From Swiss-Prot:
GO BP terms: fatty acid beta-oxidation
NCBIfam families assigned: FadJ (TIGR02440), PRK11154.1 (NF008363)
CDD domains per record: crotonase-like
A Pfam family reported for this protein in Swiss-Prot or TrEMBL: 3HCDH
Subcellular location: Cytoplasm
Reactions that this protein is recorded to catalyse: a (3S)-3-hydroxyacyl-CoA = a (2E)-enoyl-CoA + H2O; a 4-saturated-(3S)-3-hydroxyacyl-CoA = a (3E)-enoyl-CoA + H2O; a (3S)-3-hydroxyacyl-CoA + NAD(+) = a 3-oxoacyl-CoA + NADH + H(+); (3S)-3-hydroxybutanoyl-CoA = (3R)-3-hydroxybutanoyl-CoA
Keyword Oxidoreductase: yes
Taxonomic lineage: Bacteria, Pseudomonadati, Pseudomonadota, Gammaproteobacteria, Alteromonadales
Subunit details: Heterotetramer of two alpha chains (FadJ) and two beta chains (FadI).
Molecular function GO labels: 3-hydroxybutyryl-CoA epimerase activity; enoyl-CoA hydratase activity; long-chain-3-hydroxyacyl-CoA dehydrogenase activity; NAD+ binding
Location of the region described as Enoyl-CoA hydratase in the Swiss-Prot/TrEMBL record: 1-188
Designated name of the protein: Fatty acid oxidation complex subunit alpha
Keywords: Cytoplasm, Fatty acid metabolism, Isomerase, Lipid degradation, Lipid metabolism, Lyase, Multifunctional enzyme, NAD, Oxidoreductase
Length: 706
């Protein structure tokens, strides 16, 4: 069996320990490595000729990307998970206890268990390469750093900085890592090993004291001050998580116990808390999303089809969506883009949009002004069809007007090559209708982005009956290069995300008309786990947009999509939401930092907000509509699998990740229980709550999706 760790001795007395997991592109830590590392460390201890040790990766662009997550699924009990954490503690403690200097030479991803390994070394040096990132992202999987990270990190960089890293899972760039004291030096990759060897030869050195702000010095220097930090962090966590995620509170407790009662106690608490989190339903759900998205990245979207290379893209429309799509195409995908708009104003808007986003990177020192300018040079503009002939893909982001989109299809078929893909960013029009104007319908596809484009991770790739597999595969690959998570859905009104969202939003609007207050409704759904409430979302998306989509869905899918009368009343009062500063909430100079409801909206709707119902009951009534419709979408073949439905809902509308997505959540609730809830509402409120056939069958058979 090939070994992962290879020890070589140099003439100057420095030993190089190279980690290279056989057959994998990245290094990850596995349980079976424990005995192998312990054996090597015993060998080093017994060899008096070794004066220092350098730990380095044999992989091209990865130090250690973290622990192998699949190990956790093998843990049947909390005891198994605790043993895993304790094994890590033993190995890392042995490494730290070596009397010779130990230096970690870091290039590429140094995350999770990888950073914990580096923290157990006496010094760290990293490359200045853009691929080098350091962090502890375990919280994003509902976990905490279980290899001593909650103890070593605060002792190295300070409590406040360590908590910020662990509670957000943020990744740190080399310069920032040096500034915060996470690494001792940053050098070009070409001299990384040489520098690490020189550091080992120079011997152990006490870490330089981290430069802390005066406030942090005062707070972290006394037990009273430290308690303020922990209490403040706890309050912020409770506000952000609404009590739905157990990991952040446990991270704070690990640090608190370790600082007040010593490292040994801290490690004991870390192992116990880690074990509890591994077997928690929240972490299980978050890990399922991680595995699903990882699995999805290996798929082309169309079985047996390979994507064509996209060397140039054209965006039609320089508005908010067009500007955002052009921006992610140049900055993330590094693909040259030609933006076409009928007006110079639209073009200057698109350029300004892209520049503003890139300039943020310069201001945050993530990129140089020269790098920003090079990326901006990839974007060119035109008011006519010039410089578009060689486009591999054209993304249309114009007004939702079928005749206009038909004209665009004809223009592109005339001006571009026979293989050029025409991808429409429509949010409501069926792609088959847009393709009716095409002589090459196999090249027509939907590519539905969500606003704001640079922040929302999901795109829906919509295939109509005649879309070719190669067009699907190429569009999926293009979206991935833009940093997006694409799901392939079949053509149909509302596609998947807007279809399940519409019923949820309609139900919230119905509750509003029944006298529930705006803020109570929003708070109820935020407490349930959504990032924003449905009424806030309606203001952000645009009340006019919601009103436009509803009739299309009702016409194609039936009366259950009939929108409450609220939309017409609001539009009659020229309330479109944030975009025109007039919606459910106050905007503009008069609005305070904490959003206030525009109380006059109740008069427009002809209602008086009355007694607020139980928040759980409100959330349930909105959410069960979404769950029922998600299953209908699966039945109708709109989505290919429950997995795709979960990813679409989480990344497209912020369905609570800790629930794992609509289909995972239905499994948790039980189909029979969901059918009972839906039938209860059906008897009170009408046929829009009727459970779909598949749910009824699953309830009878006690079946699950996963």
């Amino acid at each position: 069996m090939e070994k992962t760790f290879n020890l070589t001795r140099r003439d100057d007395g420095i030993a190089i320990l190279t980690m290279d997991v056989p057959g994998e592109t990245m290094n990850t830590l596995k349980a079976q490595f424990g005995p192998e590392i312990s054996e090597i460390l015993a060998d080093i201890k017994s060899d008096s000729s070794i004066r220092g040790l350098v730990l380095i990766s044999g992989k091209k662009d990865s130090f250690v990307a973290g622990a192998d997550i699949s190990m956790l699924d093998a843990c049947k009990t909390a005891g198994d998970a605790k043993a895993l954490s304790q094994q890590g503690h033993v190995v890392f403690n042995e490494l730290e206890a070596l009397t010779i200097p130990v230096v970690a030479a870091i290039h590429g991803a140094c995350l999770g268990g990888g950073l914990e390994l580096a923290l157990a070394c006496h010094q760290r040096v990293c490359s200045d390469d853009g691929k080098t990132m350091l962090g502890v992202p375990e919280v994003q999987l509902g976990l905490l750093p279980g290899g001593g990270g909650t103890q070593r990190l605060p002792r190295l960089v300070g409590i406040t900085t360590a908590l910020d890293m662990m509670l957000t899972g943020k990744q740190i760039r080399p310069k920032q890592a040096l500034k915060m004291g996470l690494v001792n030096d940053v050098v070009p990759q070409t001299i990384l090993l040489q520098t690490a060897v020189e550091m080992a030869l120079a011997g152990k050195r006490a870490p330089k004291p981290v430069k802390k702000s005066l406030v942090n010095q005062v707070l972290e220097g006394t037990s009273f001050g430290r308690n303020i930090i922990f209490d403040q962090a706890t309050k912020q966590v409770e506000k952000k998580t609404q009590g739905n995620y157990p990991a952040p509170a446990k991270i704070i407790d690990c640090v608190r116990q370790g600082i007040t009662k010593g490292m040994q106690k801290g490690l004991e608490v870390e192992a116990s808390h880690f074990a509890e989190l591994v077997v928690s339903k929240e972490s299980e759900a978050l890990r399922s999303i991680f595995f699903a998205t990882t699995e999805m990245k290996k798929e082309t979207g169309a079985e047996g089809a390979s994507p064509r290379k996209v060397k140039k893209a054209v965006i039609l429309g320089g508005g908010l969506m067009g500007g955002g799509i052009a921006s992610v195409t140049t900055t993330k995908a590094k693909i040259p883009v030609r933006v076409k708009d009928i007006s110079e104003k639209g073009l200057s808007n698109a350029l300004a949009y892209a520049y503003k986003l890139l300039d943020k990177g310069v201001k945050r020192r993530h990129m140089t002004p020269a790098a920003r300018d090079n990326l901006m040079a990839l974007m060119t503009t035109t008011t006519e069809y010039k410089g578009v002939k060689d486009a591999d893909i054209v993304v249309e982001a114009v007004f939702e007007d079928l005749a206009l989109k038909h004209q665009m299809v004809k223009d592109i078929e005339r001006e571009c090559g026979e293989h050029t893909i025409f991808a429409s960013n429509t949010s409501s029009l069926p792609i088959s209708q847009i393709a009716e104007a095409a002589t090459r319908p196999e090249n027509v596809i939907g590519l539905h982005y969500f606003s704001p484009v640079e922040k929302m991770p999901l795109v829906e790739v919509i295939a109509h009956a005649k879309t070719s597999p190669e067009t699907i595969a190429t569009t999926v690959a293009f979206a991935r290069k833009q940093g997006k998570t694409p799901i392939v859905v079949q053509d149909g009104a509302g596609f998947y995300v807007n279809r399940i969202l519409a019923l949820y939003m309609n139900e919230a609007a119905q509750l509003l008309l029944e006298g529930q207050s705006v803020e109570h409704l929003d708070k109820a759904l935020v407490k349930f786990g959504f990032p924003v409430g449905p009424i806030t979302l309606l203001d952000e998306v645009g009340i006019d947009v919601g009103a436009k989509i509803s009739p299309i869905l009702e016409k194609e899918l039936g009366e259950r999509f009939k929108a409450p009368a609220a939309f017409d009343k609001l539009l009659g009062d020229d309330r479109k939401g944030r975009k025109n500063g007039k919606g459910f909430y106050q905007y503009g100079a008069s609005s305070k930092k904490a959003k206030a409801v525009d109380e006059s909206v109740y008069g427009v709707l002809g209602i008086k907000p009355g007694t607020n119902k139980d928040a759980k009951a409100l959330a349930e009534r909105c959410v069960v509509q979404m769950l029922n419709e998600a299953v209908r979408c699966l039945d109708d073949g709109i989505i290919a699998s429950p997995r795709d439905g979960d990813i679409g809902a989480i990344f497209g509308i912020g369905f609570p990740p800790f629930l794992g997505g609509p289909f995972h959540y239905i499994d948790t609730l039980g189909a029979a229980n969901l059918v009972r809830i839906l039938e209860g509402y059906q008897s009170q409120l009408g046929s829009r709550f009727e459970p779909c056939e598949r749910l009824k069958t699953m309830a009878q058979e006690n079946a699950h999706f996963f």
